[in-house]
Structure formats: structure tokens, C-alpha cells
Amino acid sequence: MAFNDLLKQVGGVGRFQLIQVTMVVAPLLLMASHNTLQNFTAAIPAHHCRPPANANLSKDGGLEAWLPLDKQGRPESCLRFPFPHNGTEANGTGVTEPCLDGWVYDNSTFPSTIVTEWNLVCSHRAFRQLAQSLFMVGVLLGAMMFGYLADRLGRRKVLILNYLQTAVSGTCAAYAPNYTVYCIFRLLSGMSLASIAINCMTLNMEWMPIHTRAYVGTLIGYVYSLGQFLLAGIAYAVPHWRHLQLAVSVPFFVAFIYSWFFIESARWYSSSGRLDLTLRALQRVARINGKQEEGAKLSIEVLQTSLQKELTLNKGQASAMELLRCPTLRRLFLCLSMLWFATSFAYYGLVMDLQGFGVSMYLIQVIFGAVDLPAKFVCFLVINSMGRRPAQLASLLLAGICILVNGIIPRGHTIIRTSLAVLGKGCLASSFNCIFLYTGELYPTMIRQTGLGMGSTMARVGSIVSPLISMTAEFYPSIPLFIFGAVPVAASAVTALLPETLGQPLPDTVQDLKSRSRGKQKQQQLEQQKQMIPLQVSTQEKNGL
């Protein structure tokens, strides 16, 4: 409780918290756009083979003479006749060939995408999904690397670097001359965006008192959801993929400029043993919050007394290996990894297939964003009233059930299937909201950012595996849905192994975690003893004593 008392002394939730939270959270609007950007920049418009250069369509009988029809009576996308198909014996054999002269695309909805510019269709169709997978690989690498660096160098320095990297790599991707260069810059964007997400949560949470952490976590979730609305609007207004890529990347230059005014986490300073910087940060916050007199009362000696436990126990450098060495941290790491993986695995299985719903992609994008608002509000109520653990369990379990039921319903029931998918997506968005907050509250300060980074890493593993599972639909259409639904249902059971953090102070050390666990065991023993006392009295009364 020592550091929380210091926060209250310098103003609790004051002007500084409101300003910094707003500035840190604002870029998340466009982070949501980057994560699902390829739904629009890599959209696949209707297309068919281009007839040979020497073809005379007016003489041959029109375009239909060169294009075979599929089972639905539509022109084939990847095949054409080698000669005009006019019903003669020579040309009526059904012999086809690939699109040797390229493709003709329907540009009415999407004037230009990476698919149409680099012909990522037919035999090259897998390259479209590869670009998104490489972006997620970047997110995975960024979560691992920058999560560790943030625990070593601080949250503020890493955020400044991440804003610049996102702005530069995103802008360069918009001017990529070929597919390979585009993928490289998208990977770099993914690395920095992963770090922005986890550093945003941590920096805000470490400057907030206990009773406000759930509010901040919910706010971050809502900003991300609003970013999905924003993407639909920007993509509709800017349909050209290069212009859209620029529109969601250039604003990060603004974030890079104002991020120099962020104040580093005093909690991180103290956990690193740098009391001079801790004092300076707290006094600066006190001035902004109008608590100069309270800030003046602070000194190195006061901090040494207040933070004696943290300074004694936080001597070692945090590393990812600590998550496996310590039994207490190892159990947390394994359980949280399963929750992160399951949430991301099912989430991206749904949101990266907007064209599969058979309706306007812009409309589905808006609906997917809209469902987050009530879903996250309900999650917020559960988090604050019942706790983090029930909220995490319910969101994963309900999401899995919705997806599993969706796999059973026949394909013709479009409205029901879409409704279940939207409901499942809302539950998974709530799960993301909860797991960010829950993870940050479970790990001690000395390794919190590393823990969040490793959790985000497991989430990216899920998002990378998800497209591979989607490919199993070629064998049976419902196989992906059964898998996407079963994983979160199974993972929901893991929440029973995690402690509740509602109303608990943030742990600063591993010792805090162990003390909390021992305190819970003692409380359970006392409750059992209280239940046994009336029974003993009742037995004595029956014996006439």
C-alpha cells in the first residue's frame, strides 16, 4: 500500500492523470485500424481472367466466350478458355487454362488494393494472408522485445521509440514498390504497435490509485472499439490502399512529438531503486495536480521509509526467465498464456474474415465495433462488482459457446449466423479488455511489463495460427468454427487457478504475491474454524454441558 499512499498524497486522480491518460490513450484509436487494416487494403474484389491480347470480343461473341462458368453460374476467377468457346466441337470440349494475361478486377468498391496491384489471387492467393501473418509475427516479436526493454529502460522511452517506428514504417509501407518491401514494413509496424498497446496500459495503470484501475482499463478498451468505427469511416472515405495506409500512419508522428512530455512511471523508478527520479516525478505530478505543499513534504528519506520493502526486494533485474524460475510466477505465466492465446486465436478467426459474411464490409466493420460498447460495459460492471476472475471466465465461455453453435447452424441462416458471430466477437473483445487489466494486476512491478509482453506474445501466436485453422474450411466449412469455439471454452476453466485482484494493491515484488496467497489460505482456515465452532457448541449442548 506504500506507493498507493504516495499517489494519494500527490493528488490521487488529478489534472495530471486526466491529461496523461488522454495523451497516452489517443493513439490507440489508430492502433485498432492497423490491426485489421488488411480487411480493406487487401480486399479481394470480383475478378476474372483477361482475354488474350489478340482477342476480338465483338467477333468472338463477347467476354462470355472466353470465360467458363462455375457451379453458381458465375465466371470463373482463375480459368479461361484457350480459344473462344462458341459451341463448336473443337472449342466445346471444356478445356481451360490459367489466366496467362492477368486479370480484370471490379474496381467499383476498391479502386486499388495490394491484391489488385500485385495480383495476389488464384495461385498467389496465399501471399495475401502471408502479409497479415507477417504483421502478426511482428506483433509477436515486438511484445517479446519491447516488453523486456520497457522493464529495463522505462515505459516512456520505449513509447517514444514505438510512436516513431510506427509512423515511419507505416508511411514507408504506403510507398512500398513491391510486395516484399511492403511486408517488411508491415512487420516493423506490428512490432511497435504491440509495444504501444502494453505500454499504454502499464504506464496509465501505474499512475492510478487502486479504485480507478478498472475504469482506465475499460476506457482503453472503449478507445480501441471506437478505432474500429474510425477504420470503417476512413476506409470508406479513402478507398485507395496506399492513401488509407498513410491516413492511419502519419498521425503517429504527432504522438511521437507530444510523447516527450510524458512523465515516466514513478512506480517503475522506485522498483528500479532510483529514488532521486522517483522523487522528481512525484513532485512534478504534485505541482500539476495543485498539491505543491504535499510534494514539498516528500524527500529521499521519506521515500526510503515508505518504500523500504520494495527497495529491499527489488535488487535483481527482471527478465523473461524469471517467469519460469519462480514457481509462483511460472503458474501465473502458464495460466495467463492460455487465456491470451485463446482470446486472440478466436478473435482474429472472426474479425479477419469480413468478406465471408456476404454483406457490406463497411457495415460489418461498424457492427463489430458497435457490439463492443455494450459488451465491454457489461464486462466493466462484472469486473467492478464480482471481480476480474468471473468476468474473464464468463467472456471466454460465452464466446466459445456462440462460435460452437454457429458451426452447427446451416449456412443459409445468414442473420442468425451473423448475429452469433457478432455476439461472440463482443465477448472476445470483453475478454481482451479483462485480460489486459488482469495481467497487469497479477504481475509484480519488477516484471509487470515483461509479463504483459509475454502475454501479448502468446496472443500473437494465436493470431498467427488462426489463419491456418481457417484453411481447414476447404475440407468441411464448419471445422474452423468448432476449433475457434472449443479453445476459449477450454481456456475458461483455467481462470479458476488464478487469484482475484479486485480491490487489491498492485504487487511490487514476488514476495507480495506469496503473501497474498498465504493471506488467502489463512482467511480460508479462519472461515473453516468459524464454521466448526457452532457445531462444537451444539454438540456440547446436546450432552447437557
UniProtKB/Swiss-Prot annotation:
Its main location: membrane. Residues 31-129, 178-180, 240-242, 353-362, 411-419, 472-478 are extracellular. Keywords: Cell membrane, Glycoprotein, Membrane, Transmembrane, Transmembrane helix. Residues 1-9, 151-157, 202-218, 264-331, 384-389, 441-450, 500-545 are cytoplasmic. Signal peptide: none annotated. The chain crosses the membrane at residues 10-30, 130-150, 158-177, 181-201, 219-239, 243-263, 332-352, 363-383, 390-410, 420-440, 451-471, 479-499. Residues 522-531 have a biased composition (Low complexity). It catalyses: (6R)-L-erythro-5,6,7,8-tetrahydrobiopterin(out) + a dicarboxylate(in) = (6R)-L-erythro-5,6,7,8-tetrahydrobiopterin(in) + a dicarboxylate(out); L-erythro-7,8-dihydrobiopterin(out) + a dicarboxylate(in) = L-erythro-7,8-dihydrobiopterin(in) + a dicarboxylate(out); L-sepiapterin(out) + a dicarboxylate(in) = L-sepiapterin(in) + a dicarboxylate(out); prostaglandin F2alpha(out) + a dicarboxylate(in) = prostaglandin F2alpha(in) + a dicarboxylate(out). One of its GO terms (cellular component) is protein-containing complex. Changing C434A: Decreased cell surface expression level and PAH transport activity. 80% decrease of PAH transport activity. Complete loss of PAH transport activity. One of its GO terms (biological process) is prostaglandin transport. InterPro entries: MFS_dom, MFS_sugar_transport-like, MFS_trans_sf, Orgcat_transp/SVOP. Multiple cysteine residues are necessary for proper targeting to the plasma membrane. Secondary active transporter that functions as a Na(+)-independent organic anion (OA)/dicarboxylate antiporter where the uptake of one molecule of OA into the cell is coupled with an efflux of one molecule of intracellular dicarboxylate such as 2-oxoglutarate or glutarate. Mediates the uptake of OA across the basolateral side of proximal tubule epithelial cells, thereby contributing to the renal elimination of endogenous OA from the systemic circulation into the urine. This is Solute carrier family 22 member 6. The lineage of its organism: Eukaryota, Metazoa, Chordata, Craniata, Vertebrata.
